[in-house]
Amino acid sequence: EITGKAVLHSVVQTEPIGPKKMCDLLVIAPCTGNTLAKLSLGITDTAVTMAAKSHLRILRPVLLCVATNDALGASAQNIGRLLNTKNIYFVPLKQDDCIKKPNSLVADFDKLEDCVTLALQGKQHQPIFL
């Protein structure tokens, strides 16, 4: 309803995002540990991962808003790979509950608007880790 456009919810529907230059910036919010893994390994079996691949194919920015309970565990290597991937940007991350969920990280969603502006300029918001 916000955009007045239909939701793209299949791999087939999202594949043209890049070639048709359907958006200037792709924001994945929230970006789960599963999505992080698939993006870092180039797996495109969901609408979200295909949208990202298609958008990156034409060298446009993708902004990730991570929210995962295993960011400092199994997902850490995927975050590391993606930090080193051209045109992928992160909303700054912080531990949301270091006592009860010591491996959990979540994006600071209050910084999303600033991160959008920076990603469109080809810049990563700093610091990445809060």
Feature-to-residue mapping (PLM):
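A cross-family phosphate/adenosyl-ligand binding-site feature
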Residues: 1-62, 67-130
